[in-house]
Amino acid sequence: ALVKETRILKKKVYGQQMVGESPAIQEIRSMIDKVAPTDARVLIQGSNGTGKELVARNLHQASNRSAMPYIEVNCAAIPSELIESELFGHEKGSFTSAIKQHKGKFEQADGGTLFLDEIGDMSLAAQAKVLRVLQGKKLSRVGSDKDINVDVRVLAATNKNLKEEIARGTFREDLYHRLSVIVIKVPSLD
């Protein structure tokens, strides 16, 4: 009963539905219905303000992980020197301002979904570490050599053309292939 009530409350909080009846929106809804029950990684592409975050939330809410955490990270908003600590956590004393142990976003999302928004803005070094977690399903916090297993479905979004970024050498091709198991393109609003 408590689980059911939690789901109902989460739907009220997260319950933003995609509006519109255009063929493009209907196709996105159809993709969400097909993809949500799987654990496949999804890359959501579209211009700023098109609703990529809404697509990610709807994927999580319709998934088998909907009762588990949904954690969002805006990769563009976190300075490159902090992204590793933010995503993977850190141990007390691992750097000057690490006054206590901190669980990263991957650990916080364990069992649920991690949404990496604006992944195209992530540094190559951070991309390599994300790739390692996706491949091995484990991470180690900054300042630790202990592996922590994580079970996380990763959704990512970008407003950039990642194939062009790969050609420029600013995005890892292997990470692109890991993230783009399924690609959902969100049309611009014009």
Question: Whereabouts are the PLM-identified features?
Answer:
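Receiver (REC) domain switch/output surface
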Residues: A1-L2
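AAA+ ATPase active-site-proximal loops
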Residues: R7-N149, V154-K160, E165, S188-L189
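Short, solvent-exposed beta-strand edge segments and adjacent coil->beta transition regions
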Residues: V13, V181-I184
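ABC-type ATPase nucleotide-binding domain
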Residues: R57, R178, I182
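Charged helix-capping and loop-helix junction motifs
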Residues: R168-F171
